Amino acid sequence: MTNIRKSHPLLKILNHSFVDLPAPSNISSWWNFGSLLGMCLIIQILTGLFLAMHYTSDTMTAFSSVTHICRDVNYGWLIRYVHANGASLFFICLFIHAGRGIYYGSYLYSETWNIGVVLLFITMATAFVGYVLPWGQMSFWGATVITNLLSAIPYVGSTLVEWIWGGFSVDKATLTRFFAFHFILPFIIAALAMVHLLFLHETGSNNPLGLISDSDKIPFHPYYTIKDLLGMLLTILLLTGLVLFSPDLLGDPDNYTPANPLNTPPHIKPEWYFLFAYAILRSIPNKLGGVVALVMSILILAIMPLLHTSKHRSLMFRPISQCLFWILVADMLTLTWIGGQPVEDPFITIGQVASILYFLLILVLMPIAGLIENHLIKL
């Protein structure tokens, strides 16, 4: 008799995706972050669901409803902080996952890669609208400043901003629709993640060598299921430590003050995971130019397959490109730091240099390094 997992229409899909899937025998721990992202998404949807049961999306009661969750709901403080810090963990995993894709040339699976870029955009949108919901000072002013950037779009800008706000300022209508978006978007992310996996399983996983591994495959279960479970266990340990010992480490103290349209905080800044893009936005004096640079800082990932010039797929055997990759990582960390600093010298200059270097590395230096390395192979 055929095993039910191989014959049942639903189980068959799961079997081909997680049990009998042929996987390269040499994929390292950098390949764990896909499953960790799946875990983060499930944690966020579950904690978010329980938070939504007690939250009210009204400007008069939103802040006090979050206080009520933390003080009066059974383990409400835990659910709230797991959700808030889970978002940070989500982005850490996202950045590492995308970084691994760049390092090992996984972007050459262009369908999988481009869906990943779309997923990154939607996740950033979800996190942004979610940050507005507690209706603290930074929530309100963050929403005002970031949505206002759309007014830089020629002709339709100001109309578009008022349309998103649902009025002439960030108010009740804005909060209600942001809550609606924040509730629906994670399910769209989950659906797209399935499409992401579908395209990945069309080609099979890449591996650290960047070589075709058809001759040396092992079944996903039990080898990689155990490996993924270990990764999940360690990640949950990290999240638990953060939530129980310093839950406000990555948050902004200003968000413990209720939103006040008449009082602007001295430094308006988004959550830490947007700071690199925010620094690029601020480094350009022109408003429209800044918005274009902000969008391009993420959209640039979509053209990475077109910028690949090397004969090698992975950076494992390409020392010059390796150096440039780690300079790019350092540059992103520098931008993240600058995004959280006030707009004054020397931070302005450092931000401008780091922004130019960011685009220069991806668009010019890495493709040139690939060509140089091709030439060196022939010697």
Curated annotation (Swiss-Prot):
InterPro entries: Cyt_b/b6_C, Cyt_b/b6_C_sf, Cyt_b/b6_N, Cytb/b6-like_sf, Cytochrome_b, Cytochrome_b_C_euk/bac, Cytochrome_b_N_euk/bac, Di-haem_cyt_TM. It holds the Pfam family Cytochrome_B. Its cofactor is heme b. Heme b b566 binds at residues 97, 196. GO terms for cellular component: mitochondrial inner membrane; respiratory chain complex III. The chain crosses the membrane at residues 33-53, 77-98, 113-133, 178-198, 226-246, 288-308, 320-340, 347-367. Keywords: Electron transport, Heme, Iron, Membrane, Metal-binding, Mitochondrion, Mitochondrion inner membrane, Respiratory chain, Transmembrane, Transmembrane helix, Transport, Ubiquinone. Heme b b562 binds at residues 83, 182. GO terms for molecular function: metal ion binding; ubiquinol-cytochrome-c reductase activity. It comes from the Eukaryota. Binds 2 heme b groups non-covalently. It is a multi-pass membrane protein. GO terms for biological process: mitochondrial electron transport, ubiquinol to cytochrome c. A ubiquinone binds at residue 201. Its main location: mitochondrion. It is found in: Mitochondrion inner membrane. Component of the ubiquinol-cytochrome c reductase complex (complex III or cytochrome b-c1 complex) that is part of the mitochondrial respiratory chain. The b-c1 complex mediates electron transfer from ubiquinol to cytochrome c. Contributes to the generation of a proton gradient across the mitochondrial membrane that is then used for ATP synthesis. Belongs to the cytochrome b family. Heme 1 (or BL or b562) is low-potential and absorbs at about 562 nm, and heme 2 (or BH or b566) is high-potential and absorbs at about 566 nm. The cytochrome bc1 complex contains 11 subunits: 3 respiratory subunits (MT-CYB, CYC1 and UQCRFS1), 2 core proteins (UQCRC1 and UQCRC2) and 6 low-molecular weight proteins (UQCRH/QCR6, UQCRB/QCR7, UQCRQ/QCR8, UQCR10/QCR9, UQCR11/QCR10 and a cleavage product of UQCRFS1). This cytochrome bc1 complex then forms a dimer. This is Cytochrome b. It comes from Macroscelides proboscideus.
